[in-house]
Amino acid sequence: GMDGLLTIRPDGKVYIQQGVGNLGTGSVFDTARAAMEALQTDWEQAEVVWGDTSKHLPWSSVQAGSMTTHAHTRANWAAGLDAKSKLQEIAARDLGGTPSSYDVADGRVFRRGNRSQGMTFARAAERAIALGGKYDGHEVPEDINDMTKTAGGALAGLGLMGIAKDNFETGGRNMSYAIGFAEVEVDLETGGVELKDYKVSSDAGTILNPRTFAAQLHGGGIQGFGHARGQKWV
């Protein structure tokens, strides 16, 4: 699996490092949402950092073969869960109890059954910096890629770090399926073809972005029209 990397900083924001590029589909942002879902915190509290390797980015997949969404929702989910675990541990250290006594949501870590007892992400980030070690990124997991270790080292000390490799079970190959139906009229004398109607259906699982999903279906259809009408055997 790929690696996920984020930092919760003293300004209270979650900075999600994204190694995938922006091809125009928005996947560089959409796949980062998995980290915020793990933290049960509003997307407006996130900042996505992407671009070249000078931005300290984690080991990532190529953007081909329908890999991006599958690989990077999982990697960011792993980083989000790692950050959540560290938030719970810090809360237990400072406020008593065990990490499992605490939950994370809405930019805070708080005691289950008593949301008033807890701390903000901003405060937890300050505590992570004070504690050091794995909490602020001075210690990182052994199983992550060397590129991610370098990125984590550059970001160490900025706040609470979530850094993890996607070690989740795969359950085999996961594929999405789409099927299209075209109604056409063919002029038997001239060979002209006119498209009258087109319907498409897709079994795609969880939709990250409805607009991008629709664009995938429309774009695939248009590409298919071009193949069918504009190409021939030579």
Task: Enumerate the predicted regions with their spans.
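Cofactor-binding beta-sheet edge motifs in enzyme active sites
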Residues: 1-234
